């Protein structure tokens, strides 16, 4: 190797592998979105609405954290931690300005399966009841949260792995009907899980296939064990919550700050329970002791990761899909963009980091996001401000929640799921717009109810792909290109006789194994139809119509016209501008079209081809030695045909 070449190679290598300062800054801003918006934060315009939204969000985070921790079969205090740490991590790495990450009903329900399976309730009598050094909780409670933290950790690892593999671009298969049906079904599961608290019943943990129906069967079998006091308090709480929230919605334009009815109800119910000693007098279940402070971080137990991999995948997929839908809705509403892959990273890190602080799996929630909308939040600063108030609850106010009745907490959760439950109204929309989507919605909801949210999500995605695969090969792949515009462009440069022997076909779809044969059939049918309009039927019937070339040669195979065929050579131009991607079968079919036409004295030219298509066809069909068949535009291809025709005329004159 010469010195000049070695120097040139080393310079190229140095240029390729030496990152520039601007590249590093851009990478940091792309992976840490907070660096992009925080320096431009407008204190004067945004701080007040973000503060108000943060206070209201903190109320939601605390109530949902307590309830979803119980839903996840762990001590309520861990729900407070799950409302704190994920929100901080997402504010740094996430792109959704109105996405409130924290505890989530669907992920809590999934993680509860692992907790109840590995540390069942009957183990409480087998483990030591002495308080541990962590938060003063029993060994049983700590074993349970370690399982939930392991689910959170492994779920986060899966999400980060999906970010590395750039699988965010594959989320297009999770359509709106699938998300709507899955979240509605999961919300129905959550409501069902709260029935025992609403009725004041003691009920064993029921899960698994058809567990939804077994729960209601158990309720009806033990209907006499319902506590009337809990039922009445639940009904009163639900009525108050629904009424006040509806009034807030009606008058939100006239009042600047809505009434925090959740907070008012918590204070009133706790005070009433304390004054009347409802826990002992009426046997109402209360939240109980809430430890103060945050424990030192500790790694989740790695030895049980293999045992929770099913729940971890469910948490990773369901949590991400639900959160992404909210982030995309926020971006669409407020006119900004998000990166689907970056959301994988943000939620993955939220789950991984939080698992070291005894947190249950996290995701964004519809109720909290809607709350940020209604209170006028501008940025993730609202979530960070809410974290300050959550810290106050953890260190100071937490013990006062001891007397909060569980039936009131369950009522708050049920009413908070209203946004998901009213998605039943989407059925009318899907029925009127696309009945196949209606069928996918109903079947996905049924599978979610009968099995679980992750099973319903998987079923919905499979149904969507099956519908696409079933309909894709039947979609029209080619069409005759409008010739009027083309004639106008070329009429000053060439005679119209050239265009009479040219057929321009537009490829409208990707060419893959699903539609390769359909492409060939469509191409032949269109050309036969065009030719049938310009020739007698008797001529067509005398031709072989099973091959592409006989279609292109105008069907004139009788003796009267056979002499004119060589002089009137036809050309086929394939406009590949709508040809977005291809596979081996697609390239094989294109080469087959070319070779078939070549053997029948028909020229096939391709316009608007990508470099990858040219390379693939050249390699597959060994076209290196062929005359030019690839052109940058349809006009260039027609000009090539016209030039060849003029050369042919000159050749004929010279022979004469």
From Swiss-Prot:
Positions of region (Membrane targeting): 641-656
Decide whether keyword Membrane is in the record: yes
Q: Which organism is it from?
A: Pongo abelii (Sumatran orangutan)
* This protein's UniProt keywords: Anion exchange, Cell membrane, Endosome, Ion transport, Membrane, Transmembrane, Transmembrane helix, Transport
Keyword Cell membrane recorded: yes
The source's domain of life comes to Eukaryota
* Location of the STAS domain: 492-641
Q: Its catalytic activity?
A: chloride(in) = chloride(out); iodide(out) = iodide(in); bromide(in) = bromide(out); oxalate(in) = oxalate(out)
Q: What job does this protein perform?
A: Acts as an anion channel mediating the transport of chloride, bromide, iodide, nitrate, sulfate, gluconate, thiocyanate, oxalate and bicarbonate ions. Its permeability towards bicarbonate is weak and increases when pH is above 7. Mediates thiocyanate transport in retinal pigment epithelium cells. Mediates iodide transport in the thyroid gland, playing an important role in the synthesis of thyroid hormones and the maintenance of thyroid function.
Query: Any one cellular component term from GO for this entry?
Result: apical plasma membrane
Query: Which InterPro entries is this protein grouped with?
Result: SLC26A/SulP_dom, SLC26A/SulP_fam, STAS_dom, STAS_dom_sf
Q: How does it sit in the membrane?
A: Multi-pass membrane protein
Membrane-traversing stretches: 76-96, 147-167, 171-191, 203-223, 228-248, 255-275, 307-327, 344-364, 384-404, 405-425, 449-469
Compartment(s): Basolateral cell membrane; Recycling endosome membrane; Apical cell membrane; Lateral cell membrane
Q: Which residues lie on this side of the membrane: Cytoplasmic?
A: 1-75, 168-170, 224-227, 276-306, 365-383, 470-656
Q: What is this protein called?
A: Anion exchange transporter
Which protein family is it in?
Belongs to the SLC26A/SulP transporter (TC 2.A.53) family.
Provide the GO biological process annotations. Answer: iodide transport
Tell me the residue ranges located in the Extracellular compartment per UniProt: 97-146, 192-202, 249-254, 328-343, 426-448
Concerning Gene3D superfamilies, the annotation shows: STAS domain
Q: Which residues form a coiled coil?
A: none
Q: In which broad location class does this protein mainly occur, judging by the first location in its UniProt entry?
A: membrane
Recorded GO molecular functions are: chloride:bicarbonate antiporter activity
């Amino acid at each position: 190797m010469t010195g000049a070449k070695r120097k040139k190679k080393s310079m190229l290598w140095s240029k390729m592998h030496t990152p520039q300062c601007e590249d590093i800054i851009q990478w940091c801003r792309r992976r840490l979105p907070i660096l992009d918006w925080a320096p431009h934060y407008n204190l004067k315009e945004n701080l007040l609405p973000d503060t108000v939204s943060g206070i209201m969000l903190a109320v939601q985070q605390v109530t949902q954290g307590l309830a979803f921790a119980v839903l996840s079969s762990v001590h309520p205090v861990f729900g407070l931690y799950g409302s704190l740490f994920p929100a901080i991590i997402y504010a740094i790495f996430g792109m959704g300005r109105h996405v409130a990450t924290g505890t989530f009903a669907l992920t809590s329900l999934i993680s509860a399966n692992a907790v109840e399976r590995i540390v069942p309730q009957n183990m409480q009598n087998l483990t030591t009841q002495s308080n541990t050094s962590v938060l003063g909780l029993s060994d049983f409670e700590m074993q349970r949260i370690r399982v939930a933290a392991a689910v959170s950790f492994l779920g986060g690892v899966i999400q980060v792995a999906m970010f590395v593999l750039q699988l965010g671009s594959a989320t297009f298969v999770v359509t709106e009907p699938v998300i709507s049906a899955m979240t509605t079904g999961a919300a129905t599961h959550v409501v069902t899980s709260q029935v025992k608290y609403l009725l004041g019943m003691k009920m064993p943990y029921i899960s698994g296939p058809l567990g939804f129906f077994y729960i209601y069967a158990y309720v009806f079998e033990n209907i006499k064990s319902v506590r009337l006091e809990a039922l009445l308090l639940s009904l009163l709480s639900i009525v108050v919550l629904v009424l006040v929230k509806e009034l807030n919605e009606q008058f939100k334009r006239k009042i600047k700050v809505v009434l925090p009815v959740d907070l008012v109800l918590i204070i009133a119910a706790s005070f009433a329970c304390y004054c009347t000693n409802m826990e002992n007098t009426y046997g109402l279940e209360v939240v109980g002791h809430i430890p103060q402070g945050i424990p030192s971080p500790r790694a989740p137990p790695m030895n049980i990761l293999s045992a929770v991999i099913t729940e971890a995948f469910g948490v990773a997929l369901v949590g991400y899909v639900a959160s992404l839908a909210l982030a995309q809705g926020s971006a669409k509403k407020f006119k900004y963009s998000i990166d689907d892959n970056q959301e994988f990273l943000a939620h993955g890190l939220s789950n991984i980091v939080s698992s070291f602080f005894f947190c249950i799996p996290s995701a964004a929630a519809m109720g909290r996001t809607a709350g940020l909308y209604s209170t006028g939040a501008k940025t993730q600063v609202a979530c960070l401000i809410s974290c300050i108030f959550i810290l106050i609850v953890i260190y100071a106010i937490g013990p006062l929640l001891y007397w909060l009745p569980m039936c009131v907490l369950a009522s708050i959760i049920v009413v908070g799921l209203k946004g998901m439950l009213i998605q039943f109204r989407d059925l009318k929309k899907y029925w009127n717009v696309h009945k196949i989507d209606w069928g996918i919605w109903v079947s996905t909801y049924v599978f979610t109810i009968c099995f679980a949210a992750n099973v319903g999500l998987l079923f919905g995605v499979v149904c969507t792909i099956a519908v696409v695969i079933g309909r894709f090969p039947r979609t029209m792949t080619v069409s005759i290109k409008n010739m009027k515009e083309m004639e106008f462009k070329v009429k000053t440069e060439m005679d119209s006789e050239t265009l009479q022997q040219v057929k321009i076909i537009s490829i409208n779809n990707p060419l893959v194994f699903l539609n390769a044969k359909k492409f060939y059939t469509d191409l032949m049918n269109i050309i036969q139809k065009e030719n049938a309009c310009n020739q007698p039927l008797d001529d067509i019937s005398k031709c072989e119509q099973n091959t592409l070339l006989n279609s292109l040669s105008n069907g004139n195979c009788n003796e009267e016209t056979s002499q004119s065929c060589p002089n009137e050579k036809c050309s086929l131009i394939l406009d590949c501008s709508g040809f977005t991607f291809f596979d081996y079968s697609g390239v094989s079919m294109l080469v087959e079209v070319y070779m078939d036409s070549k053997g029948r004295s028909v020229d096939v030219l391709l316009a608007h081809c990508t470099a990858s298509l040219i390379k693939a066809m050249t390699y597959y069909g060994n076209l290196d030695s062929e005359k030019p068949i690839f052109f940058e535009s349809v006009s260039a291809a027609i000009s090539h045909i016209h030039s060849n025709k003029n050369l042919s005329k000159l050749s004929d004159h010279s022979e004469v």
